[in-house]
Amino acid sequence: MIASGVPIIAWRLWHVRRHEDAYRLESFTWHHVSWPARTRFEAECSTHGAAAPVRGHECGIYAFRTRELAEDLLRRYTGVRQHYGRTRQELPPLRQGCPIAIGRVSLWGRVLARENGFRAQYAYPYELFLIGGQDDLAGQLRRLYAVDVSPS
């Protein structure tokens, strides 16, 4: 476990989905789990009573050490494409109205290091880059989460 008073900055992905009155960040692999605005996101585990994350268990908020590792996860959802006889993995074509955010995230509390990243107790977006989103959506997320958001 990493014990530090300074947050760890890592990378992760989010879906950007409309929830009633506004677009919100939603976990990339756990659908329908929205990240709260202007307050920390806290890991929960219904399997054990201890605070997440716990060694030997898969609970916690996941994040990658590098942007490249986060992009690799995104590519795994798209498959491989052939281009001029060479195999390439491309970022996915986005469905209309379903943008994705890749960005840096602050992690703190109980943090467990893994080979390619971390699992944390608490997290909050630090900086976001939208894939498939327009300037107006970037502005909405910027105001809602109070972080820098850039359309890609």
Residue ranges and their predicted role:
Residues 1-37, 41, 71-152:
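Conserved NAD+-utilizing ADP-ribose enzyme module
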Residues 41-52:
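A glycine-rich, hydrophobic loop/mini-helix early in the fold
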Residues 51-76:
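Extended catalytic/binding region for NAD+/ADP-ribose chemistry, centered on the ART fold
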